[in-house]
Amino acid sequence: MMITKQSYQKFALMRVFVFSLSAFIFNTTEFVPVALLSDIAKSFEMESATVGLMITAYAWVVSLGSLPLMLLSAKIERKRLLLFLFALFIASHILSALAWNFWVLLISRIGIAFAHSIFWSITASLVIRVAPRNKKQQALGLLALGSSLAMILGLPLGRIIGQMLDWRSTFGVIGGVATLIALLMWKLLPPLPSRNAGTLASVPILMKRPLLMGIYLLVIMVISGHFTTYSYIEPFIIQISQFSPDITTLMLFVFGLAGVAGSFLFGRLYAKNSRKFIAFAMILVICPQLLLFVFKNLEWVIFLQIFLWGIGITSLTIALQMRVLQLAPDATDVASAIFSGSYNVGIGSGALFGSIVIHQLGLGYIGFVGGALGLLALFWLRFITIKFKKT
């Protein structure tokens, strides 16, 4: 009996690991264009600002597509659906690698965004299903770890490949790695019938849960604030702090590395007091932004701020996702789809707000505005916490 139990634990952990790898590859491809923007612009003889529109387009496609695409796929067996998503993901990366003009590249990115929309709508609930019985919370932490590793390893490796070969090779390699992950998924995952996915009828039911709606608004507010600053952190460090490109790269690496610590802290502390955990994580996101300009020339302080900020945003993202699942156990996929859409509204809005701040006030002010949006989100958290204290 002990061998059977050990075998179960081993396979369950391997399945969680496959989902973590999947999170890694999806998050890598979402943000790797940032590291390749100049090279892509040069190859198409375009301005970087114009090419950057594909990042905005990606976020908005995910925002608009998450819920309707999840509903369309609600009754499909989950393993089959995942393999289809990876097929679309891989084919779109092949098209990215072969793109003969910017519009073809944009179309390929939209294909990837469609896969992303459904993947993140169903993955959180699935990783909890396949995890060992006593490791559900840790499984969600491992999923977030995969996302963090995309920032630590995925983006730097993507840039290195792009510099050594070309940007097309980066997309080709991502497609190749995704193929290996899909094979692992096909081999390791059991049949996963759709369960508690929810239907279109679930949407009005969820909308009648005020705390859940409050959490979605909180996600939009705090992520908008985060990406108001984070979208332009690289030019801030180079132009305002006047640190070298190598130091800038190291700081971005530290930000990603901090995500690992954030995942660990979530696994250890969230269950003890979820409300305080979310509030503390938000403070870790807000304070470094507000103080970014104040300590702009103190290298070690900026490193510390970046590290704490990275811990905060990773911890907060997982905690809010877990809270959504707890508030909607009867429609986990619909709830996750709305969460993913809300998160990407925050990404797109934050990048837009940051651009407006830079043009109207200057690059040095992004942290103040991003932090101010975060403070509004913190006040909103306080309000819904008091109003729905027993929920």
Swiss-Prot record:
The lineage of its organism: Bacteria, Pseudomonadati, Campylobacterota, Epsilonproteobacteria, Campylobacterales. It comes from Helicobacter pylori (strain G27). GO terms for cellular component: plasma membrane. It is a multi-pass membrane protein. The keyword Transmembrane applies. GO terms for molecular function: carbohydrate transmembrane transporter activity. Pfam families: MFS_1. The chain crosses the membrane at residues 16-36, 51-71, 82-102, 103-123, 138-158, 171-191, 210-230, 247-267, 277-297, 300-320, 338-358, 361-381. Belongs to the major facilitator superfamily. SotB (TC 2.A.1.2) family. The keyword Iron-sulfur does not apply. It is found in: Cell inner membrane. This is Probable sugar efflux transporter. SUPFAM superfamilies: MFS general substrate transporter.
